[in-house]
Regions:
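Active-site neighborhoods and metal-handling regions in enzymes and metal-associated proteins
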Residues: 1-588
C-alpha cells in the first residue's frame, strides 16, 4: 500500500505540472510571520509531510519532497519520515544547501510560493536575476477538512499588570516611526499588536495572541483589522475597527503613504503593495522585550508559583514506582499542577516529558497514543514545561533522575550541563554585548570535551506572550531570519538551557530564566549581570562533586537557599519537608 503522504504529494505534483511549476515551498508560518500558528495555516504542511515537528519548511519538486529542519528536530524527523519518500535535509549542517540555494542550483523555476508566508528578506533570497520566475501560489485548498480561522473573544490585561498605559505604548511606537521619517506604521506581528493594545487572545495554542493587523498613522489614527464580534464591550472607542480580511484592500488605498515596515517581520506581499516603504525594525518588537518594574515583579511572583507545580511533580515521581512512570502521565500531571493555580490561564508550549532515549529528541512530546513507560533500567525523565499566567510567561527544564542506579556517564553529563549553566548565569558583561557575544561562556565547557548541542543556548521570553521572543538569544552562530542578536539590556528576560544529547541513548537539559540587570559602573563603562528568576532545585543525584569548583558549589548552595526562601511561603504543608530536603546544603 502506498504511503499516505506520498499519495498526497503525487496529487500535489500533478497539480503543479498543470500550473507549470517546477517546485513549491510550504513554510511553517502564517501571514504574520508567527513561530507557531493556528491550524488553518499550519495544516497544509502537516497534510503533505509526515514530519510532526513545529519548525520545518517543505520543498516539493516534480520528482520528490524534502523537509528542512534544524538540529533540534533531526532525531524526531528521522523517525517521522520512515516509510515515506520524504527526504530530511539537515538544515544548518555543513554542506547542506539552504532551500533558496537548492532551488537556484537545480533551476527549480518557475517556483510557486505564497508571498504572504515569507518575509521580504526571505523572498529576496530566491532571486538572482530576472530569469528566476516566482509565482504567487497556494495549494491550501487541497487540504481535507481545513479548519476556519479562530473566532473567540479577545480579553484585556488588567492595568495593574502593566507598567505602561495604552496611550503611552501608542505614543512610544509612533515616536520611533517619526524618527524614521515615516508617516504610518504597520504592525503585522501578533505579539506586537497584543503588546501595544494590552489585549490577549486564544487563537494559537499556548500563545495568547489574536489574528489581526494594526495600522497607525503619525497623526494618531489607529486602525485594527479584526472581526468586530471578537471584541469585548469595553474595547477603546478611539480605535477604528475593520474586518480582518479587508486589510490588503485597505492598504491599496494607503499605498502612497510613507509607511514603516520591518523587512524581516512583515510578509513580502505587504511590502509589494507599498509605493514608499520605509524599512526599519518594528518599534514594538524592541519595546515589548524590555520588561518594566511591574512586569518584573509579577514575573518573579509567577515563577515562584511555577516552582510549586514542579515541586508537586517531583513528589509524584518520588512516590510512583519506576515501572509505573510514563511520559504521558507525567506530562498530564505537571500540566494539571500548573492549571490548579488561578493565575495560570494556559501552558506556554506543549509540555516535553521524555524518558531516556526519547530525551535526546529536543522537542519530543508524548501523547496518549504515543509515549514510553519507564522500566527498571530507566535513569532519567526530562521535563521542559511552562505556563501562561496573569503576570508572566515561564519556561523551565529539569532532568529528573528516576533510576535506582545512575550511571557515571549520566552524572558526568548532568554535572557538565550544570557547570555550563552556571558559567553563563554568573557572567558580568559590558553594555553593548549581545547574547551571541556571550554564548561561548556556556558552550566552551561542552566543546572542551568534544560535545555540542545543536540549538541555541537560550531565547528571550515574553510577558503573557510568546515563550520565544526576540530580539535576544544565546547562540554562537547566526540563524537565518531568527533575528536574536540584539543587545542585552536591563529588563530583558532570557533563558539559559544547555544540554547533552546522545541520540538513541539519553538527553539532559537544564533551563532557567535570567533577568538582565545593571551590575556596576566604572570609568571604563557600564556593566550588566544576570539574576536567576527560576526557582526549582537541581537533582543532587546527578551531581558529581569532583567536577565542581568551590565557586560553582557555592553558587549551587546559594541558589538552593534562595529557592527555599522563595518557595516556602507558597509551599503546601505536605511538600514542605521535601522542599527542605531538596534544598539542603551540599557538602563535599
Amino acid at each position: 500500500m502506498q504511503n499516505l503522504f506520498d499519495s498526497r504529494i503525487e496529487k500535489l505534483q500533478a497539480q503543479m505540472r498543470k500550473d507549470g511549476l517546477k517546485a513549491y515551498v510550504i513554510p511553517a508560518t502564517d501571514p504574520h510571520m508567527s513561530e507557531e500558528c493556528t491550524a488553518y495555516f499550519a495544516r497544509e504542511r502537516f497534510y503533505f509531510c509526515p514530519f510532526k515537528g513545529s519548525d520545518g519548511t517543505l520543498l516539493v519538486t516534480l520528482d520528490g519532497y524534502f523537509i528542512y529542519t534544524d538540529g533540534r528536530f533531526w532525531t524526531e524527523a528521522e523517525g517521522d519520515i520512515k516509510g515515506s519518500s520524504c527526504i530530511l535535509m539537515y538544515q544548518g549542517k555543513e554542506g547542506v544547501l539552504s532551500i533558496p540555494q537548492y532551488v537556484k542550483q537545480n533551476n527549480l523555476y518557475p517556483l510557486g510560493l505564497d508571498k504572504k508566508l515569507l518575509s521580504r528578506q526571505e523572498l529576496a533570497a530566491y532571486f538572482s536575476d530576472d530569469t528566476h520566475e516566482i509565482r504567487q501560489a497556494s495549494y491550501r485548498h487541497m487540504v481535507d477538512d481545513l479548519p476556519e480561522l479562530p473566532h473567540d473573544k479577545i480579553f484585556k490585561i488588567d492595568d495593574s499588570l502593566l507598567s505602561t498605559t495604552l496611550e503611552e505604548r501608542i505614543k512610544n511606537v509612533l515616536e520611533d516611526t517619526k524618527e524614521h521619517n515615516a508617516d504610518a506604521l504597520i504592525l503585522p506581528l501578533l505579539d506586537d499588536i497584543a503588546y501595544v493594545l494590552g489585549y490577549r487572545g486564544n487563537d494559537i495554542p499556548c500563545t495568547p495572541v489574536f489574528y489581526s493587523y494594526l495600522y497607525l498613522t503619525a497623526e494618531g489614527e489607529v486602525t485594527l483589522f479584526i472581526d468586530k464580534e471578537r471584541l469585548p464591550l469595553d474595547f477603546p472607542s478611539f480605535i477604528r475597527v475593520l474586518p480582518y480580511e479587508d486589510f490588503y484592500a485597505f492598504l491599496e488605498t494607503r499605498k502612497d503613504i510613507k509607511t514603516l515596515i520591518d523587512p524581516f517581520r512583515t510578509n513580502a506581499y505587504i511590502a509589494s503593495l507599498l509605493s514608499h516603504p520605509v524599512f526599519a525594525p518594528s518599534p514594538a518588537f524592541e519595546q515589548k522585550s524590555i520588561k518594566g518594574p511591574v512586569e518584573v515583579r509579577n514575573t518573579k511572583e509567577i515563577q515562584a508559583i511555577d516552582g510549586i507545580a514542579l515541586l508537586k511533580l517531583q513528589k509524584y515521581l518520588l512516590d510512583t514506582p519506576i515501572e509505573e512512570i510514563d511520559e504521558y502521565k507525567a506530562r498530564i500531571f505537571v500540566d494539571r499542577a500548573r492549571r490548579e493555580n488561578p493565575r495560570c490561564f494556559d501552558l506556554s508550549f506543549e509540555t516535553i516529558a521524555a524518558l531516556d532515549d526519547n530525551a535526546a529528541m529536543m522537542h519530543y512530546a508524548p501523547s496518549e497514543t504515543n509515549h514510553k513507560t519507564a522500566d527498571k533500567n530507566s535513569q532519567l525523565l526530562l521535563v521542559d514545561s511552562g505556563g501562561q499566567y496573569y503576570g508572566g510567561t515561564t519556561d523551565t527544564t529539569r532532568t529528573f533522575l528516576i533510576g535506582k542506579e545512575i550511571s557515571e556517564e549520566v552524572k558526568h553529563d548532568y554535572t557538565l550541563t550544570l557547570k555550563s549553566q552556571i558559567a553563563l548565569s554568573t557572567t558580568i558583561f559590558e553594555k553593548g554585548c549581545s547574547g551571541h557575544s556571550l554564548d561561548i561562556k556556556a558552550r566552551e565547557i561542552m566543546w572542551k570535551e568534544g560535545l555540542d548541542y545543536k540549538c541555541g543556548t537560550g531565547h528571550g521570553v515574553g510577558y503573557m506572550s510568546c515563550v520565544h521572543e526576540g530580539p535576544i538569544g544565546f547562540r554562537f552562530y547566526d540563524r537565518p531570519n531568527r533575528l536574536d542578536n540584539g543587545e542585552l539590556k536591563p529588563g530583558h528576560i532570557i533563558t539559559v538551557e544547555p544540554g547533552v544529547y546522545k541520540p538513541h541513548k539519553y538527553g539532559i537539559r537544564l533551563e532557567n530564566n535570567l533577568l538582565v540587570k545593571e551590575a556596576f559602573t566604572t570609568s571604563d563603562g557600564i556593566f550588566y549581570s544576570f539574576e536567576t528568576i527560576t526557582y526549582f532545585p537541581y537533582d543532587r543525584r546527578g551531581i558529581d562533586l569532583s567536577l565542581l569548583t568551590d565557586e560553582e558549589l557555592q553558587w549551587l548552595n546559594d541558589y538552593h537557599k534562595m529557592t527555599e526562601e522563595v518557595l516556602k511561603p507558597l509551599c503546601p504543608r505536605e511538600l514542605l519537608s521535601l522542599l527542605e530536603d531538596l534544598c539542603k546544603e551540599i557538602k563535599r
